[in-house]
């Protein structure tokens, strides 16, 4: 897998939305050749305020929002503001764009906990969304993230696009001047809190007339769809 364009979230707590928009860009480019930048603000503004307060997003909620509603091109929704302003912008303008965002959905996602599962996903061409604790003393030295775990600075979301003998190849959203041109190696022994496989492998559901999304294996999903077709005859 290759990295996508390096983005910069600035002072806005939109790391989850930045990573997800980059993943959608990856799928658009690899599947159709479409290299347009996708909107961070559309994903961030679609955050459900009833679930929690404060900045940022819960990864699972963000994944579900992108599965249901997708994303639009950056030019359609070019905002990167902090909440609650971002949510108000979305409520005013974002809902008008559902028809354009719907084709840019992910089809399914699943949480994984083993290194082998992460590597299998990457080999299949699926990026892996990740979250880890961030410390104030973290820095990238010779391309590798280092820390003494001093000064807890909250959680941070990025995405994994590969690996080597040193650790996971990770793309960040702090601009090209950060780390190794915006990327880094996260050592295998460094604590990662969450990892999610993000897939754009759409399976058609003939009953609902829309993509069938689940966390079942593809063979099982195919069997389900065959049964559905039989009962639809």
Set out the residue ranges of the language-model regions.
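Short amphipathic alpha-helical segments, especially helix-boundary/capping motifs
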Residues: 1, 37-42, 93-95
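Asp/Glu-centered strand-loop micro-motifs enriched in Gly/Pro and often flanked by an aromatic residue
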Residues: 1-10
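Homeobox/homeodomain signature
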Residues: 2, 33, 174-176
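Predominantly the structural core of cysteine protease catalytic domains
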Residues: 11, 17-25, 49-171, 176-221
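Phosphate-handling active-site elements
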Residues: 25-42
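Acidic/histidine-rich, metal-coordinating catalytic segments
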Residues: 38-48, 133
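Low-complexity, charge- and small-residue-enriched intrinsically disordered regions
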Residues: 221-233
């Amino acid at each position: 897998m290759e990295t996508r364009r390096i983005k910069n979230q600035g002072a806005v707590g939109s790391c989850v939305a930045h990573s997800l928009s980059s993943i959608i860009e990856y799928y658009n480019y690899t599947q159709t050749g479409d290299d347009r930048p996708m909107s961070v603000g559309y994903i961030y503004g679609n955050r459900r305020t009833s679930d929690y307060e404060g900045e940022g997003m819960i990864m699972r909620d963000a994944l579900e929002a992108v599965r249901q509603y997708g994303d639009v091109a950056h030019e359609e929704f070019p905002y990167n503001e902090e909440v609650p302003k971002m949510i108000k912008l979305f409520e005013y303008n974002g809902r008008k764009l559902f028809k354009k965002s719907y084709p840019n959905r992910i089809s399914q996602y699943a949480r994984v906990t083993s290194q082998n599962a992460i590597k299998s996903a990457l080999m299949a061409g699926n990026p892996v969304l990740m979250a880890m604790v961030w410390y104030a003393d973290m820095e990238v030295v010779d391309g590798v993230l280092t820390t003494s775990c001093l000064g807890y600075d909250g959680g941070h979301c990025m995405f994994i696009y590969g690996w080597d003998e040193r650790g996971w190849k990770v793309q960040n959203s702090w601009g090209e001047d950060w780390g190794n041109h915006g990327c880094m190696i996260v050592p295998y022994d460094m604590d990662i809190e969450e990892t999610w496989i993000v897939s754009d492998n759409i399976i058609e559901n003939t009953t609902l007339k829309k993509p069938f999304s689940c966390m079942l294996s593809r063979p099982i999903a195919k069997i389900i769809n065959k049964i559905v077709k039989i009962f639809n005859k």
